[in-house]
Amino acid sequence: MAAVSTTTRKALRPTSRDDFEIAIVCAKALEYDAVCLLVDGFWNEDGDSFGRAEGDLNTYTTGYMGGFNIVVVLLCDPGEAAAAGATASLRSSYTRITLLLLTGTCDVVPDAMGKELLLGDVVISDTVVQYDLGSHYPNGRESDTLGDRLGRPDKNVRSIIMIFKTELGLQRLKEKASIYLEKIQHKASKEQRRKATYKYPGSTNDILFKSTYCHKHYRSPQCICDDYNEAGDRVCDNSRGTLCEQTGCDKDYLVPRLRLEDKKKLEDDDNVKAAQQPSIFVGRFGSGYTSLRLAIDRDRIAQKHNIIAFETEGAGTWDELSCIIIKGVSTYGDGHILSDLKSWENFAAATAASVARGLLDYYPQTDRWPSVESKNQTDTAFGNQADIACLRDLYITSPPDDRIRIEQTKGGLLMDAYVWILQNDAYKQCLAWTITYAYF
């Protein structure tokens, strides 16, 4: 693999909220922690100096990442409603955000697009469908209802997503994500409390049951779980939060997968770096109020609406700002609960943060012209009027203004320069000396 460079340049220190271009939103603390490990530096280590708009209840973390000034938001609660409210408030305080990245964890359709999707892989949104299943459990589940597909991404988002639908763009992003994942793991390893938090849980712990094999109590004749069938009979409430090892879920019903065999070989060769590298997929998210808990529901909705992953916040952020959802796979949305679920959640949060960070290396920075607020804050920082006047003169002019000025002169600039030369004292003196010298 060719060496891949990463961007760590420092952004100019912002003078106001208008200087922030990128927002990152996370629903859980573990997702926020993973993102913050990739922030190159923080602007609010000594307190928040940028404030927020009236009525905005968000708490912001500000810093820079890959040359961009960024603002990170941790939702007060997971879910669509909290995401929608937080994003609307974000937009009112940070009015110049050009891109919002919603990062975190998701449930995946393991055989979407005819491919094998594994735990720790990352899904990037190209579209989002909002769904509401009612109850997602076998007992009393309602028929699924889906709203219209949410608004089409704007050109800003579509242009960057199209790059990652190409083999070249996707491979480059994958290589960068691998580097940033190692960076997260290295930084976390320096802290005893979370030394192994983002460690790859291993291919043997990536377990997928057949879609028809429900998570319930087995070998319990007195339990209502014993009467369950695929038509929708009840399972007991206690089974929903119980580990597969305790319910008696039989590993004879596991699905074999070729990619896991490849990862196992890499691990046997002590090449964990290659084994943990996530694959990246671009496709449609399903966004609902709660997570899926039944594989047959997952597969039915996915097949009908071409969905490859499910999550719970995207519908709340999608239409508020230019948004890309980037989420790591932590479960298969089938209700099965593994003993190392927490490890997969942390690892998936890290892979998602790594892909989000890699994406920013390809996102073009927008030319910025100083806002009135920025100029006023600069004026306040310098008391000397001469300094203020000098700083104002140094502000870069706007190309549209320059174009208008040049068009209005209609070639006059050349004439003005010619006249200036002829009237210049140094030129006149030189000309007089030349004429005098010519007479001798």
Features from the language model and the residues they span:
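N-terminal flanking helix/linker immediately upstream of nucleotide/cofactor-binding cores
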Residues: 6-13, 385-440
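Intrinsic-disorder/coil detector with helix-boundary
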Residues: 2-379
